[in-house]
C-alpha cells in the first residue's frame, strides 16, 4: 500500500468530487463521478450493487481515480489501486453516512441498497498546475 502525502490526503478529506475509472467486460473504460472517503488510508466509494461500476469491480478489482480541489481546480491527484473489500449492510451505512456528511452535512438517504468498495492504493501522484 502506498502512503498518501498531506496534499493528497487534503483532497480526499475535503468535499471534492472524484472520478473513478473501472474496466467493462470488453476492456473499455467506464468513468463516473463519485463521493469518496478515507478509511484508514484506504479509499471508500459507495454505489448501488447493481451499478455498472459495481459489476466492473466485482469482475476486475483494478481502479483509477482522479480528484481535483473544488476551490482550487489546478490542484489534483491521480490514484491507481484495487478493491480489497466490499462492505454491506449496517457496516456499509456507517461509512456511507460519514461520506455523506462530508458532502451534504446529513446522513445518506435510505430506501435504496448501497455497498461500499474499499480501495487499497498502489500508486498516488499529486500536482498543482500553474
Features from the language model and the residues they span:
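Short, surface-exposed beta-strand-loop junctions and turns on beta-sheet-rich folds
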Residues: 51-53, 72
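A short, aromatic/hydrophobic, helix- or strand-capping loop or linear motif
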Residues: 24, 67-70, 106-113
Amino acid at each position: 500500500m502506498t502512503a498518501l502525502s498531506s496534499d493528497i490526503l487534503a483532497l480526499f478529506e475535503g468535499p471534492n468530487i472524484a472520478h473513478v475509472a473501472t474496466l467493462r467486460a470488453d476492456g473499455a473504460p467506464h468513468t463516473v463521478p463519485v463521493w469518496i472517503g478515507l478509511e484508514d488510508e484506504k479509499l471508500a466509494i459507495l454505489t448501488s450493487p447493481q451499478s455498472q461500476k459495481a459489476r466492473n469491480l466485482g469482475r476486475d478489482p483494478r481502479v483509477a481515480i482522479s480528484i481535483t480541489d473544488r476551490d482550487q481546480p489546478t490542484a489534483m491527484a491521480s490514484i491507481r489501486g484495487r478493491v480489497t473489500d466490499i462492505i454491506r449492510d449496517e457496516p456499509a451505512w456507517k461509512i456511507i453516512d460519514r461520506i455523506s456528511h462530508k458532502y451534504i452535512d446529513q446522513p445518506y438517504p435510505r430506501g435504496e441498497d448501497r455497498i461500499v468498495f474499499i480501495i487499497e492504493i498502489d500508486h498516488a501522484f499529486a500536482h498543482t498546475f500553474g
